[in-house]
């Protein structure tokens, strides 16, 4: 089931060719369970961010804005950014000693929980042999075979170091293979910070209130065409207006960088047909959705096979990683097999490969995605019901271990709809939940994530906290 974004207080689904079972199973036996160590009253009395404030003020003299990625500065939600000291399971602890149930999960990679014992042990063994070789290693073969066997579209894969790198490489490859330069992306979809993609790019720029980024030459985006998400007619018009010039259509199959937005069946099926009819490639950016919506990603979930796919986050188990892959005839254009050049000093490094291998092994265990679906449904519906009880218009949805909610009536089908959300109210909600010991993404325009480490106790605590906070707003 795919949950649409409605204002009804429930997550309603539309039918699709999903391979996900809706059966509810018990949680995998290996998931981490960490008890809340203090009561709600004790937590609120002890909550302070003094050390975080001091460290952040010092950081602002050392790094632009005090951070190394803009959303971490809390610009769109206000308040004091927290500096994290340690993580384990579903929890994080800041340098002031505050404990949080975490629904960011390092922005997606921590699907089996933070600092998993098996992953840490495997990394320790790998590090005894070295941290980087700058040469091929057997671990690359192992992870490549796992990715190829899991993701329907991938017959060959190239590992890189980030989602941005993956999207840069896949766009260059699409242009090389088709010998066309224009491509279509969607408003609110984020594909990294390469120049060609920084047009109506979703959360990365929405957080700062900017439509794009200074420093991006007009020439770099002259071949970037944009359309509203879920608007297949707009895409058809672009193909008509630029006949024979469009190399590819790239999208987040479920948007995570405008908040959480799902595709309509007409839209996602229509894209597959339009690209085939016009000699263009369909690219799924599955940096967020890969191995999260299903073991085979969004393409398995929806039953739509693109020509090329980008991956990241989960396949590195929390270490820097990215990948792009697809049909063999396309991938054989990548150097050194073919003329399309792309390289990387740390690509395929043994640490990221190790963490990825052990993360995917865990995800392949029976009951994994049924458990994620169960707890995420409970969480999302609980938060929406809390909004209903306290008189706050909200809408939201979920698929497997990915979810989102907006302070808006809904429904939300695209970035224009998402921007109608009450961001001031979201900021109040975010800050209130932080004091309650719950860490959501510090932006209305970001999806949230659950993990195998989240327990029913975590979910119930979060729902109760949401009702308390919403009751005070």
Swiss-Prot record:
One of its GO terms (biological process) is chlorophyll biosynthetic process. The keyword Coiled coil does not apply. It is found in: Plastid, Chloroplast. GO terms for cellular component: chloroplast. GO terms for molecular function: glutamate-1-semialdehyde 2,1-aminomutase activity; pyridoxal phosphate binding; transaminase activity. Its EC number is 5.4.3.8. It catalyses: (S)-4-amino-5-oxopentanoate = 5-aminolevulinate. The modification N6-(pyridoxal phosphate)lysine is found at residue 313. Keywords: Chlorophyll biosynthesis, Chloroplast, Isomerase, Plastid, Porphyrin biosynthesis, Pyridoxal phosphate, Transit peptide. Its cofactor is pyridoxal 5'-phosphate. InterPro entries: 4pyrrol_synth_GluAld_NH2Trfase, Aminotrans_3, Aminotrans_3_PPA_site, PyrdxlP-dep_Trfase, PyrdxlP-dep_Trfase_major, PyrdxlP-dep_Trfase_small. The keyword Plastid applies. Signal peptide: none annotated. Residues 1-37 form a transit peptide. SUPFAM superfamilies: PLP-dependent transferases. Pfam families: Aminotran_3. Pathway: Porphyrin-containing compound metabolism; protoporphyrin-IX biosynthesis; 5-aminolevulinate from L-glutamyl-tRNA(Glu): step 2/2; Porphyrin-containing compound metabolism; chlorophyll biosynthesis. It comes from the Eukaryota. PANTHER family: GLUTAMATE-1-SEMIALDEHYDE 2,1-AMINOMUTASE, GLUTAMATE-1-SEMIALDEHYDE 2,1-AMINOMUTASE 1, CHLOROPLASTIC-RELATED. Homodimer. Belongs to the class-III pyridoxal-phosphate-dependent aminotransferase family. HemL subfamily. This is Glutamate-1-semialdehyde 2,1-aminomutase, chloroplastic. The gene is GSA.
């Amino acid at each position: 089931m795919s949950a649409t974004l409605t204002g009804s207080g429930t997550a309603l689904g539309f039918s699709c060719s999903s391979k996900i079972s809706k059966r509810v199973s018990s949680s995998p036996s290996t998931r981490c369970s960490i008890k809340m160590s203090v009561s709600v009253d004790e937590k609120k009395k002890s909550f302070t961010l003094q050390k975080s404030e001091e460290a952040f003020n010092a950081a602002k003299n050392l790094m632009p804005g005090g951070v190394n990625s803009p959303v971490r500065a809390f610009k769109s939600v206000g308040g004091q950014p927290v500096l994290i000291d340690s993580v384990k399971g579903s929890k994080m602890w800041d340098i002031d000693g505050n404990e949080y149930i975490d629904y960011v999960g390092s922005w997606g990679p921590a699907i089996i929980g933070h600092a998993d014992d098996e992953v840490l042990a495997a990394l320790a063994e790998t590090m005894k042999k070295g941290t980087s070789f700058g040469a091929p290693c057997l671990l690359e073969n192992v992870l490549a075979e796992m990715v190829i066997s899991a993701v329907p579209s991938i017959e060959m894969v190239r590992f890189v170091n980030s989602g941005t790198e993956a999207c840069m490489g896949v766009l260059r490859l699409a242009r090389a293979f088709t010998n066309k330069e224009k491509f279509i992306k969607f408003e609110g979809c984020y594909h990294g910070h390469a120049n060609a993609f920084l047009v109506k790019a979703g959360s990365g720029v929405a957080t700062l209130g900017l439509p794009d980024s200074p420093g991006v030459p007009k020439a770099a985006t002259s071949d970037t065409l944009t359309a509203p998400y879920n608007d297949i007619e707009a895409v058809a018009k672009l193909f008509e207006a630029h006949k024979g010039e469009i190399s590819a259509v790239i999208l987040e199959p479920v948007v995570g960088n405008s908040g959480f937005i799902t595709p309509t069946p007409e839209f996602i099926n229509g894209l597959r047909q339009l690209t085939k009819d016009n000699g263009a490639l369909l690219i799924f950016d599955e940096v967020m959705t890969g191995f999260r919506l299903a073991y085979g990603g969004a393409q398995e979930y929806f039953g739509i096979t693109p020509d090329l796919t980008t991956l990241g986050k989960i396949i590195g188990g929390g270490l820097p990683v990215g990948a792009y892959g697809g049909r063999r005839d396309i991938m054989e254009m990548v150097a050194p097999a073919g003329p399309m050049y792309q390289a990387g000093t740390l690509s395929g490094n043994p640490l990221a490969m190790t963490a990825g291998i052990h993360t995917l092994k865990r995800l392949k265990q029976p009951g994994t995605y049924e458990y994620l679906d169960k707890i995420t449904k409970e969480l999302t519906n609980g938060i929406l019901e809390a909004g209903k009880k306290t008189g706050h218009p909200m809408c939201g949805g979920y698929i497997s271990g990915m979810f989102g909610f907006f302070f808006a009536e809904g429904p939300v089908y695209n970035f224009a709809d998402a921007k109608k959300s009450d961001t001031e109210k979201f900021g109040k909600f975010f800050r209130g939940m932080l004091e309650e010991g719950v860490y959501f993404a510090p932006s209305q325009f970001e999806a949230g994530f659950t993990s195998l480490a989240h327990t029913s106790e975590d979910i119930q605590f979060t729902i109760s906290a949401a009702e308390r906070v919403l009751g005070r707003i």
